[in-house]
Amino acid sequence: MQKTFFIIKPDAVKRHLIGQVLDRIERRGFVIERMEMLMLDEERLKEHYAQLADKPFFPSISEFMMSGPAVIGIMSGPGVIKSWRDMMGATNPGDAAPGTIRGDFATAPDGDMIPNIVHGSDSEESAAREIKIWFGE
């Protein structure tokens, strides 16, 4: 069974959208194997976003991701990585179609891709790496 890592980001937590996001996951038939609400830390964020850690905009990402609690988790199901990415919608909320999580809930100004409600691994390799970073598995 395929697994993926997800984050319900601080903007969604602040707006009380956790239940609505989880409802969509469960209605799709995916199994939430692990889940935890926590304050994300800079050390693991640098590891998670390793390809961005030396970019000039990384401090903005880090500051946002540490601005409040987030929900991290592991879900599983057939084709969960692609399906979850489709459910999330385009990374830029302004490009996200209605019916996707970002299209329905994201309120970031067009072009601001940081507060975009959710994160999901983009490949099996990324999922394994992100699960190890956040859950030690």
Curated annotation (Swiss-Prot):
Keywords: ATP-binding, Cytoplasm, Kinase, Magnesium, Metal-binding, Nucleotide metabolism, Nucleotide-binding, Phosphoprotein, Transferase. Its EC number is 2.7.4.6. One of its GO terms (biological process) is UTP biosynthetic process. It catalyses: a 2'-deoxyribonucleoside 5'-diphosphate + ATP = a 2'-deoxyribonucleoside 5'-triphosphate + ADP; a ribonucleoside 5'-diphosphate + ATP = a ribonucleoside 5'-triphosphate + ADP. The active site is at H119. Pfam families: NDK. Coiled coil: none annotated. PANTHER family: NUCLEOSIDE DIPHOSPHATE KINASE. This is Nucleoside diphosphate kinase. It comes from Streptococcus thermophilus (strain ATCC BAA-250 / LMG 18311). The gene is ndk.
